[in-house]
């Protein structure tokens, strides 16, 4: 009887293994694609070997594997073969559509007004990237003299133009030329406040130099050379706030407190709810790992004396705008967004791209990003993937020092071994906390 049961168990095990690997991606065996690559991500059984179109695939110790196949225009046949199973995938890649260059249309200067707060003023007529040079306030008066696609060209000064989305402005008639009223400056222990007043709302730009910030207000209706510049010395570690009410700009630049007990840190667990984030080789959802790390980090920082605010403490949907508003309402000094990375539709080596990277947008956050990237890699044992710039919504505000930490790559088999370990969340949390301590305390 015992021999019979043993034989049955061995038979069932063999039957299960004969099915072979489990693919998380791709989800369909046949697809029409505009992508340059097809990604194969999944888990292999013990002792299983896999090849994709004849190329042997590396399998991590936990069974995780990943591979990318470059797609040519037209039919693509991909054979995934193991010693247990063979599957065939078919992709049809559409021919790329050649982009048509849209010309700039010039026209006589006319006046428009910004119709909502936080309207991006850009250096180029492109909706995306690092081209934001200001975020304009509602009722700001602008002069436009051209258009390209969905953007108007904004005339700021004789040697300065910018671009704003057509949807962000409304036409107005009979605008009166603004006049300068006054300028004032006040210094406090850890902050400097400067004001500059006009008879109506005017556009501005920011330019960060090594030791100062140039805050420029433009009055092109008066003349092409009417530019008012505030030269604001900046501390080593700082953040700033800009407000505009009835033509008066208030610019406040604050020095970051040097004691953790005086710091408010917003800990942001990326994604959540229906936003799953990236999917790992073994089928894990990024949102859950993000939350686990965030909870560990929050507890660590509270123990160290920091005031901690979380954007989510459970698996729920929180919009990007709400995450930013949480930080602003709580007067956050530091914002840390926690994520795991994945490979996009670009010619990356799926095995080379691994480890921890940290993103920042504003120059005041660069040093903090460098410290945290080094600290997380040291504590978590991840490869250092670098410090980079990106226009992520949660780190764009200048009201705080903000970074987004990509702790590891969900789609990398070696990283999969790390982020699936029980200690990963605690190690990453310690790395971020150590980075905050070093950055805040190293005045």
Language-model segment annotations:
Residues 12-22:
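Bacterial Sec-dependent signal peptides at the C-terminal "C-region" and cleavage site
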Residues 20-29, 33-35, 43, 47-49, ...:
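Short linear recognition/processing motifs and adjacent strand/loop elements at protein termini
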């Amino acid at each position: 009887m015992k021999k019979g049961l043993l034989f049955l168990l061995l038979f069932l095990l063999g039957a299960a293994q004969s099915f072979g690997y489990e693919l998380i991606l791709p989800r369909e065996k046949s697809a029409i694609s505009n992508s340059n690559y097809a990604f194969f991500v999944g888990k292999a059984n013990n002792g299983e070997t896999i090849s994709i179109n004849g190329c042997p695939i590396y399998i991590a110790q936990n069974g995780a594997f990943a591979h990318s196949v470059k797609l040519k225009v037209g039919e693509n046949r991909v054979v995934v073969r193991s010693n247990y199973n063979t599957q065939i995938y078919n992709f049809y890649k559409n021919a790329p559509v050649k982009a048509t260059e849209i010309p700039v249309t010039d026209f006589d200067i006319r006046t428009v007004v910004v119709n909502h707060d936080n309207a991006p003023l850009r250096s180029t007529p492109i909706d995306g990237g690092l081209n934001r040079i200001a975020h304009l306030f509602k009722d700001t008066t602008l002069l436009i003299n051209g258009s390209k696609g969905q953007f108007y060209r904004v005339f700021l000064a004789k040697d300065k133009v910018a671009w704003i989305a057509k949807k962000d402005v409304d036409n107005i008639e009979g605008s009166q030329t603004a006049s300068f009223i006054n300028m004032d400056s006040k210094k406090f222990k850890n902050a400097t406040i400067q004001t500059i007043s006009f008879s109506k709302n005017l556009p501005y730009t920011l330019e960060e130099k090594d030791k100062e910030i140039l805050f420029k207000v433009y009055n092109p209706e008066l003349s092409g050379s009417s530019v008012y510049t505030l030269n604001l010395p900046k501390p080593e570690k700082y953040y700033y706030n800009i407000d505009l009410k009835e033509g008066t700009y208030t610019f406040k630049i604050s020095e970051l407190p040097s004691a953790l007990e005086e710091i408010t840190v917003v800990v942001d667990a990326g994604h959540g709810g229906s936003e799953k984030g990236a999917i790992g080789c073994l089928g894990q959802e990024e949102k859950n790992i993000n939350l686990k790390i965030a909870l560990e980090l929050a507890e660590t920082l509270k123990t160290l004396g920091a005031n901690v605010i979380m954007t989510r403490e459970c698996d729920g949907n929180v919009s990007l705008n709400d995450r930013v508003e949480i930080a602003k309402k709580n007067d956050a000094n530091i914002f840390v967004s926690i994520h795991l990375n994945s490979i996009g539709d670009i010619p990356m080596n799926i095995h080379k791209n691994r480890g921890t990277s940290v993103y920042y947008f504003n120059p005041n956050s660069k040093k903090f990003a460098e410290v945290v990237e080094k600290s997380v890699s040291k504590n978590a044992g991840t490869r250092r993937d670098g410090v980079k710039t990106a226009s992520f919504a949660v780190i764009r505000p200048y009201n705080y020092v903000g970074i987004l930490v990509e702790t590891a790559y969900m789609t990398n088999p070696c990283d999969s071994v790390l982020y699936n370990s029980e200690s990963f969340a605690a190690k990453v949390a310690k790395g971020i906390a150590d980075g905050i301590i070093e950055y805040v305390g190293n005045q």
